[in-house]
């Protein structure tokens, strides 16, 4: 059986934490920032964790 290939699009968007969870930047901070409050933009800076429903799928795509 051949080796599985990593999906580079997924691998570039997520980082693996020490506990095996996936960390990603939050959506909504690319454009149209004038309509968002400073508090909202500040909260979007922090990376978010992937929820458990998608975790298994993304890990499989990253060959983890």
From Swiss-Prot:
GO biological process, alphabetically ordered: translation
PANTHER family: 54S RIBOSOMAL PROTEIN BL35M, LARGE RIBOSOMAL SUBUNIT PROTEIN BL35M
GO MF terms, alphabetically ordered: structural constituent of ribosome
Record SUPFAM superfamilies: L35p-like
Keywords carried by this UniProt record: Ribonucleoprotein, Ribosomal protein
InterPro entries: Ribosomal_bL35 (IPR001706), Ribosomal_bL35-like (IPR021137), Ribosomal_bL35_sf (IPR037229)
Family as reported in the entry's similarity comment: Belongs to the bacterial ribosomal protein bL35 family.
Entry superkingdom: Bacteria
Entry protein name: Large ribosomal subunit protein bL35
Any one GO CC term of the record: cytosolic large ribosomal subunit
Basic residues: compositionally biased ranges: 23-44
Region (Disordered): 19-44
Coiled-coil regions, chain positions: none
Organism: Protochlamydia amoebophila (strain UWE25)
């Amino acid at each position: 059986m051949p080796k599985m290939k990593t999906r580079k699009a997924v691998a570039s968007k997520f980082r693996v934490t020490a506990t095996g969870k996936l960390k990603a930047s939050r959506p909504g901070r690319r454009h149209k920032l004038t309509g968002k409050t400073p508090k909202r933009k500040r909260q979007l800076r922090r990376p978010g964790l992937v929820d458990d429903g998608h975790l298994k799928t993304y890990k499989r795509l990253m060959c983890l």
